[in-house]
Amino acid sequence: MSAPLEKELLSRWQEWFNESPPASVELLAVGRRYRNSYTLLPFPNGGQEPVCVVKVAAGEEQASKLRREFGNLTLLRTRLTDQALLDSFPCPLALVHRAGLVVAIHSYVSGRSLPSALSYPHQREVIPRVLDSVAEWLVAFQAATKSEAPAPDNGHGDLADALASADEIELLRQMEGNGLATPQKMSGVWGFQHGDLKPEHVLWRGRSIGVVDWDEMRSGSVTSDWFYFLALSALQIGGVESNRQLGQAAPTLEAVFFCRHWFGELAMQATHRFLDRLSLPRSMAAPLFVLSVCRDSRYLWPYLAQGASGAYRDVMRLLKRRWVDLVFNRAA
């Protein structure tokens, strides 16, 4: 399988990288296969860093993800002018079909895997810088894309349809009843959002970040990206801490954010700075966190209510109501 891909790379090397091609490249499979897809990193002879990323898909589901990601990256490349932003995500190079496979080739984005920066106690002093860098990137991305993304309506509209539950609608009503704007009415935070901002999709560069895996990009609020990132970062840190203390279960999101936990405190401080940059009141921090996690609950469910019993929908309804009560009965 690697021979046709190697031939494709070498034949277009000059075009993509503006230099003469090497005698050969070594294609290394990284990570694990996932639903008929895998990733290759091509290293030229003697090279210390891969020159690009090759994503290969055999099934239609994964092939459609590659096409969608390639289209999203192409759209961003044609619309954005901020060079710092352009340098933070991959450049799409080619989308080719070979022997029943769909192959997407992107430029390589350097940086340190963010989960490794969140996993060790001695890294704790770095985490505020990491959080601020992610927040700054999201604010810049929103500012650069707000004129490109379709605008939301002025009511609950599309947001309500997407939530598929009366509990979130009630949360939106309570937000308005407490004098807080809902995401639908926050035009200052509407633009394109990454859509899947997990820690493993963020690369730490010391003073800036890189962002990869763009197949879920869509119109929306950057606040959703932010709180989804915080929730998964909390789970990453909680899991590492529980592994160090044998027999202790990882803390739930509720424990991290509504009880005293060092990451919850750092996350809330970073959230206040994030909202300041967006010119939003800090009192929106907790409601927006709950709303975002409620919307992503099907992905976060195993961590939301550890030890809970009962039907999924019933438990989630009780949990969301408790979170709403926590939000509006605590100081923001």
Descriptions of predicted regions:
Residues 5-23, 146-194:
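An alpha-helical support segment within catalytic cores of ATP-dependent transferases
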Residues 89-101:
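Short beta-strand micro-motifs within the conserved protein kinase catalytic domain, predominantly
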Residues 17-46:
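ATP-binding glycine-rich phosphate-binding loop
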Residues 98, 106-124, 143, 293-307:
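A glycine-centered beta->alpha junction motif in the catalytic cores
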Residues 207-257:
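Active-site Asp-x-Gly
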Residues 41-69:
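ATP-binding glycine-rich loop module of kinase domains
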Residues 278, 293-332:
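ATP/Mg2+ or Mg2+-diphosphate-binding catalytic cores
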Residues 75-83, 109-152, 182-186:
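Conserved kinase catalytic-core helix
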